[in-house]
Amino acid sequence: MKNTLFLLICFLASLPASPAFSQPSARIAGGPYLQNVTEDGFTVIWTTTTDAAAWVETAPDDGTHFYAVERPKYYDSHLGRRRLGKLHRVRVGGLEPGKTYRYRIMQQAVLSDEGNKRVVLGEGYGSDILKHAPYPVTTPSADRNELEFWMVNDIHGRDSVFRLLIGDAPRQKPDFVCLNGDLLNSIESEKALFEGFLASASELLT
């Protein structure tokens, strides 16, 4: 009987974890992309595959390892409470004008949400800074007197046209790109937004 029980335990231990008992992980679904880049900050927006709590970590672009020291964290929060959801908006502030920074986006899946009573979060996941360099961003200089922006409109969901229009942006580096209107024929879902132009905007402009 003991041998049978021992073999049963060994067999169960060798089985892969059932999806029903495995913890969900929040991965990046779309983005990131930047908005409202000012002399002292910027806003990062992205979506995740499941409800999550999110934050952004920043470091100066000074050649050091991103985690050489503990980096400041900026949370997606409102009135001191962290927002939970699939769409994340994090404002990074307190930066210096005319300086280049690196940033990393992070998120933790919501395992249990009991409202004001308790929220249980899973393991943290984020943009891969081992295989790819952290995302760069440069704050505008305080003494500049001109800027360059590009405007795109009326592509009506033709992502290939959008990519042609902004394809040279990584080389020419406009200060920002204005997405003006009629970029889709209709907006039925977040997926349509990313497939229509936002995925390409994130790839080419971030």
Residue ranges and their predicted role:
Residues F6-P16:
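Bacterial N-terminal signal peptides
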Residues Q108, S112-N116, A142-T206:
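Active-site neighborhood of divalent metal-dependent phosphoester/pyrophosphate hydrolases
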Residues M1-T4:
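Positively charged n-region of N-terminal signal peptides that target proteins for export
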Residues F21-M151, H156, P170-R171:
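Acidic, histidine-bearing metal-coordination/catalytic regions of metal-dependent phosphoesterases
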Residues L15-S18, K173:
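Hydrophobic alpha-helix-in-membranes signature
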